[in-house]
Amino acid sequence: MATRNAGRGTLCVSWIGVAKFFLADWRLSCIFLVPPSVVLYFVHSSKGLLFLLSALALVPLAAILGGATEELAIHAGPAAGGLTNATLGNAPELVLGFFLLRAGHIEALKASITGSIIGELLLVFGLAVFLGGIGREKQVFNRVAVGASTTMLVLAVVGLVMPALFDLSVFGSMQPGGAATERLSFLTAPILIGSYFASFIFIFRTHRDLFRSPVRASAQVTAAATLLVLVVCGGLIAFESAVLVGGIESVTHALGWTERFVGLFVIAIIGNAAEHSTAVTMAIKDKMDLALNIALGSSTQVALFVAPLLVIASHFTQHRMSLVFPLLEVLAVVISVTVATLVSFDGETNWFEGVLLISVYAILAVFFFYSPAA
């Protein structure tokens, strides 16, 4: 009897932890939008309305999935936890990207990848530096960790620039659908993914002392409850992503926007909204190492893991995707990586540097808004 009561007590504590997890984050206030979006989908409501509801519903779902992934990473330990964060942490972007790929929205898909990278490096990094720097002369952070992230982003730039340069030098124009380019992209993708996972050996094995957190977090929820949250949340993200992709054409026609702009500044922001707020919150608390790890780490994950993985996945669908991005998007990524590197190379930031980062993002947004479809 005592054992049975102990088991019930453990189960009760577990689900109390789940409840606290759901109530602790203001981003989860949008979770009430999930049921209406499901109901309206099955009654065949307006696709524009469904696009809006599903976009807003993805924000809390991404936050829940991110929190559950961190809980699972704590249970798994430092090394395995890093691998868990690398894979499951990108689930919202991967799921949304897969549905865009399956629907043939290649332009929007590539734009969302570009938008995620420049959004993290300029908008999120900029907001974190600006809001964190208010009332402080400067904020300092680990230069080694940031240096590793920016170096990996340079590799991502090489992976994006070389396919485009190949097309320009061989064919005289950028043809993202060419057989040769698709083959080269397919061969380049595993190299980018391999380099990304090699970084975990650097962080968690050979140079772990440089990246060790001063405080080790403890799990708040049992592993079983965490896995259940991951499964349910993953299914809902897949559903909402499918609904959102189905409404892209309606939104572009109604608002007069291009698929490129929607991908760059709507889908990209939605997919990373949960991480955006976390990075800014950490910076305000003067935890710049965590803030920069989120901003720079997320852009690295998208460039070296999400994008090449979608390239490989496209070879198993009807719509092929290459690493040849439109020239304006490639230039935007190069500019973003350059500016972010210049701001972070000295290991300290101030609020004015945040203003500069946000200004660059705003300039890019203006030019992309008025640029024609790719």
Give the residues covered by each predicted segment:
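Helix-loop interface residues and adjacent transmembrane-helix termini in multi-pass membrane transporters
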Residues: 45, 75-76, 102, 258, ...
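Long, well-ordered mid-to-C-terminal structural blocks that present hydrophobic/aromatic surfaces
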Residues: 233-278
